[in-house]
Amino acid sequence: MFITLEGGEGVGKTTQQALLVERLRQEGYACLCTREPGGTALGKTLRELLLHGDPFSPLAELLLYAADRAEHVSKVIAPALAAGQVVVCDRFTDSTLAYQGYGRGLDLEKIRQLNHLATGGLQPHLTLWLDLPPEVGLARAKARDRLEQERLEFHRRVYQGFQALAAAEPQRIVRISAQGSPAEVAARLWSVVEPRLPLATAGREP
């Protein structure tokens, strides 16, 4: 089963990913915990450039994320799924649509085509969207990297993007309120994940 966590800055994805993976392992599931960018050696290099380097043009940024994703799927995600593991990934294709599409204003259909090329059509079985108003998330994040230092209007557009994506695919993308303590949010996530675990099968777009 392939699970992704999505959301804006400061929503607590890293914390919730760790708690979810811990719970899955307690329940006896073999898990892979990974992230984008940064899930491969190439990804770690690109992550440093993308999050802490000088700004790129929107198109260059998009293509770097796609290169990271192609390597990540090929070398990490696809082999783990083939081995029967539950893969839990911090960010995937929906982040590219929200940030580079809605946030940067790049063409959504072209981003979808590039995502499809980079992933070979691989889609998450379940996407957990951690929902938190941008103003609250940015206050939590305290501008730790370049993306978090973007203007509030950019983050509002990203938030609207996640709203639109969730509305378009309600069976896959489930909104989870990120308000409350980490334990409270983790309980909400588990209530969504647990019923879907018996249905875990490898899934690809047609």
Curated annotation (Swiss-Prot):
ATP binds at residues 7-14. It comes from the Bacteria. Belongs to the thymidylate kinase family. Phosphorylation of dTMP to form dTDP in both de novo and salvage pathways of dTTP synthesis. GO terms for biological process: dTDP biosynthetic process; dTTP biosynthetic process; dUDP biosynthetic process. This is Thymidylate kinase. One of its GO terms (molecular function) is ATP binding. Keywords: ATP-binding, Kinase, Nucleotide biosynthesis, Nucleotide-binding, Transferase. It is an enzyme of class 2 (transferase). Its EC number is 2.7.4.9. GO terms for cellular component: cytosol. NCBIfam families: DTMP_kinase. It catalyses: dTMP + ATP = dTDP + ADP.
